C-alpha cells in the first residue's frame, strides 16, 4: 500500500505533476484512448490541476481544457481556462454555450470515517456532475468520472447506460488498494430527445 503510494507520489514529483492522480488518467487513456488531440475537455473538480496538466502536455495538441472547481487552482496554460464555482450553479451558458468532446472528473466529496456515508456523498456528487455533463457533452462525447464503490453504484451505472453506448468500471493500478475509488468510463453520449 504505502510503497505504491510512495512510488506514484515520487513519480509525480519527478515528472513535475501537481498530484499522483495524474497516473489514474494516464492509465485510463492508455486503455480506452478516449481523449483525442483536438478535443475540448471539461475537467470537473480540477484542482490542483494534474488531469488538466497531463491532457495539455501529453494528449491535446490543438484542443483545450476548461477546469472548474470550488477550490482555487494554480495551474496555468495558454489553452486552459479556470472557472471557480460550484457545478450545481452551472449550465451550458457558464461555458458560453460551448459543448465538450469529453468531460472528466476526479472530484470527491468531503469524506468521513464512515465508508457508506462517503459512498452516498460520492454518488450525489457524481449525479450533479452528470447533470452538468448531459448539458455540455457533444453527441458521441465521452465521460470519465471517479466514484466510491458501494450499494448505489449499480443504479448509477444503469442511469448512465441510458445515455451512453457503454459504461465500463475501471480501477487504476495507481489507486491505493484500500481505496474504494473506481472510475466509470462512459463512451459515446447520446442526448435523449
UniProtKB/Swiss-Prot annotation:
Major subcellular location class: cytoplasm
Q: Name one Pfam family in it.
A: FtsJ
User: What is catalyzed by this enzyme?
Assistant: uridine(2552) in 23S rRNA + S-adenosyl-L-methionine = 2'-O-methyluridine(2552) in 23S rRNA + S-adenosyl-L-homocysteine + H(+)
Which residues take part in binding S-adenosyl-L-methionine? 49, 51, 69, 86, 106
Enzyme type, top EC level: transferase
- What EC identifiers does the entry list? 2.1.1.166
Q: Which UniProt keywords apply?
A: Cytoplasm, Methyltransferase, rRNA processing, S-adenosyl-L-methionine, Transferase
HAMAP family recorded for this chain?
Answer: RNA_methyltr_E
Function comment? Specifically methylates the uridine in position 2552 of 23S rRNA at the 2'-O position of the ribose in the fully assembled 50S ribosomal subunit.
Name of the protein this chain belongs to: Ribosomal RNA large subunit methyltransferase E
- Species whose genome carries this gene: Brachyspira hyodysenteriae (strain ATCC 49526 / WA1)
Amino acid at each position: 500500500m504505502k510503497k505504491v503510494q510512495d512510488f506514484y507520489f515520487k513519480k509525480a514529483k519527478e515528472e513535475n505533476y501537481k498530484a499522483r492522480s495524474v497516473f489514474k488518467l494516464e492509465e485510463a487513456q492508455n486503455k480506452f484512448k478516449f481523449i483525442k488531440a483536438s478535443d475540448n475537455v471539461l475537467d470537473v473538480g480540477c484542482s490542483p490541476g494534474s488531469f488538466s496538466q497531463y491532457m495539455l502536455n501529453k494528449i491535446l495538441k490543438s484542443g483545450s481544457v476548461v477546469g472548474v472547481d470550488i477550490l482555487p487552482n494554480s495551474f496555468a496554460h495558454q489553452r486552459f481556462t479556470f472557472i471557480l464555482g460550484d457545478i450545481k450553479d452551472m449550465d451550458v451558458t457558464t461555458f458560453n454555450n460551448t459543448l465538450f468532446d469529453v468531460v472528466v472528473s476526479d472530484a470527491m466529496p468531503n469524506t468521513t470515517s464512515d465508508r457508506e456515508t462517503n459512498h452516498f456523498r460520492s454518488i450525489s456528487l457524481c449525479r450533479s456532475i452528470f447533470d452538468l455533463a448531459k448539458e455540455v457533452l457533444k453527441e458521441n462525447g465521452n465521460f470519465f468520472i471517479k466514484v466510491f464503490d458501494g450499494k448505489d453504484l449499480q443504479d448509477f451505472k444503469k442511469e448512465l447506460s441510458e445515455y451512453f453506448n457503454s459504461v465500463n468500471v475501471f480501477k487504476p493500478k495507481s489507486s491505493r488498494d484500500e481505496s474504494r475509488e473506481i472510475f466509470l468510463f462512459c463512451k459515446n453520449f447520446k442526448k435523449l430527445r
